[in-house]
């Protein structure tokens, strides 16, 4: 006897936009008019690689009529959020549940963990001592750095077996020095994404006062400062052959070539906007939905920030560290959806300990992982009305592609014509950026003469 298509695919709907703290009982109440197969066992939540709720779930129903009833709940609200309901099937459900969450094949059986919250200047020896008694494979430790060669506060460690990695996870929230360390399951694929630097962002880096533009070959004309040179020489802290095991990144970053990053999207939370610190943040969002915080107490921890946004559940928190190794009082917080980022803005001007905290939205509806194109970047940096220090304000910036013109906001005689691309919306208050460009422009023009 042949099963019908519906019988083979089941009666499944996918739900998106659930509150982070949502339980199976709450989903049952949301679908109270529908008959869910096996009760709460028919509700399958989707989790991130770190084991956090993704805000999505599959719901198995008893018949096609129940599916139709469930679809009528689309765009109804649960708490303060509206919930989307889509028709799905058991094939999609099985595949997604198998390939997501902390126990997916992408994260299992390779022995990787990711550490977050390391003290500034933490060495590999300190990490080895932290995991004393647990065998780490040779060259199995990676300490990523940002574009200025500074530690990001994260590390990847590969243990000799998955069983040892599981033991390492039990040290979650233990301390190195005065900092408690968060430990998450990771994978070789995640390590690769940290090894492949955001090349488009390199092209956007502010030139130093002694950097000189190249011969006007698109991205190749961007000055390469000392921080970039440190990273180009393998300043990721060793391990895995200095990129070579992951595709030979030591051969160069593809300046002026087609290798110039067409595969990754990033949400910029820094740039030269001095409201975001000096010259940009090392934070790179994978969702494109971020909120920037300013005015944090200097003793604030990542856990304090998670609690600040409760009941929302941020995916990631990045506390900025200044060149002197001290916290700047600013942080970037990544959310899974634009709706969550907008909801988080309700906390603007709320107090954390003895200080009120300012929030700046860096998210647009319908984006995921930034707003990249092969040839241009559009950044939407929205600030609250009257906020000071915003070089870009709420202007839209477009450009930075391969172009023969630039529009950094000065007179035409002061603008570069060698391939910077341009497109800062006519802003001229770029925290010294114009002056540097003018100096570089005069050097560049004298070389051509």
Swiss-Prot record:
Modified residues (Dimethylated arginine): 233
Localization, UniProt: Nucleus, Nucleoplasm
Residues modified to Omega-N-methylarginine: 233
UniProt main location, coarse: nucleus
InterPro entries assigned to the protein according to its UniProt record, in alphabetical order: ESRP, Nucleotide-bd_a/b_plait_sf, RBD_domain_sf, RRM_dom, Znf_CHHC
Classification via SUPFAM superfamilies: RNA-binding domain, RBD
Record flagged with keyword Acetylation: yes
Residues recorded with modification N-acetylmethionine: 1-2
Region entry 2 X 19 AA perfect repeats, spans: 354-392
Residue numbers of Phosphoserine PTMs: 23, 54, 63, 90, 310
Function noted in UniProt: This protein is a component of the heterogeneous nuclear ribonucleoprotein (hnRNP) complexes which provide the substrate for the processing events that pre-mRNAs undergo before becoming functional, translatable mRNAs in the cytoplasm. Binds poly(RG).
Listed name of the protein: Heterogeneous nuclear ribonucleoprotein H2
Lineage: Eukaryota, Metazoa, Chordata, Craniata, Vertebrata
Gene that produces this protein: HNRNPH2
């Amino acid at each position: 006897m042949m099963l019908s298509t519906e019988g083979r695919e089941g009666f499944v709907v996918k739900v998106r936009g659930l509150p982070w703290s949502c339980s199976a009982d709450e989903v049952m109440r949301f679908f109270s008019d529908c008959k869910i197969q096996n009760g709460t066992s028919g509700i399958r939540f989707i989790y991130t690689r770190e084991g956090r709720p993704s805000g999505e779930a599959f719901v198995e129903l008893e018949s096609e009529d129940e599916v139709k009833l469930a679809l009528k709940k689309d765009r109804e609200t649960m708490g303060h959020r509206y919930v989307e309901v889509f028709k799905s099937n058991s094939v999609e459900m099985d595949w997604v549940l198998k390939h997501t969450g902390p126990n997916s094949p992408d994260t299992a059986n390779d022995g990787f963990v990711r550490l977050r919250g390391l003290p500034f200047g933490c060495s590999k020896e300190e990490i080895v001592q932290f995991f004393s008694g647990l065998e780490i494979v040779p060259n199995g430790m990676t300490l990523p750095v940002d574009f200025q060669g500074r530690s990001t506060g994260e590390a990847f460690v590969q243990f000799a077996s998955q069983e040892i990695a599981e033991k390492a996870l039990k040290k979650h929230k233990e301390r190195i020095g005065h900092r408690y360390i968060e430990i998450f399951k990771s994978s070789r694929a995640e390590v690769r994404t940290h090894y492949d630097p955001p090349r488009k962002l390199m092209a956007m880096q502010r030139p130093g006062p002694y950097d000189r533009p190249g011969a006007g070959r698109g991205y190749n004309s961007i000055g390469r400062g000392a921080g970039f040179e440190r990273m180009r020489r393998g300043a990721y802290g060793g391990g895995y052959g200095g990129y070579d095991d992951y595709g030979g990144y030591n051969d160069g970053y593809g300046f002026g070539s087609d290798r110039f990053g067409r595969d990754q999207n990033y949400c910029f939370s820094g740039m030269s906007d001095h409201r975001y610190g000096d010259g940009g943040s090392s934070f790179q969002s994978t969702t494109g939905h971020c909120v920037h915080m300013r005015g944090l107490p200097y003793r604030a921890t990542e856990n304090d920030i998670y609690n600040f946004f409760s009941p929302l559940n941020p995916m990631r928190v990045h506390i900025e560290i200044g060149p002197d190794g001290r916290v700047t009082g600013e942080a970037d917080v990544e959310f899974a959806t634009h709706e969550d980022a907008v909801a988080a803005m309700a906390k603007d001007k709320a107090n954390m300990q003895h200080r009120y905290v300012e929030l700046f939205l860096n998210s647009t509806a319908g984006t995921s992982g930034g707003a990249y194109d092969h040839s241009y970047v559009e950044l939407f940096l929205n600030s609250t009305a009257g906020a000071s220090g915003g070089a870009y304000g709420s202007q839209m910036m477009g450009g930075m592609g391969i172009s023969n013109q630039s529009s950094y906001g000065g007179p035409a005689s002061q603008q570069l014509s060698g391939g910077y691309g341009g497109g800062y919306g006519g802003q001229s208050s770029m925290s010294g950026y114009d002056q540097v460009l003018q100096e570089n422009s005069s050097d560049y023009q004298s070389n051509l003469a």
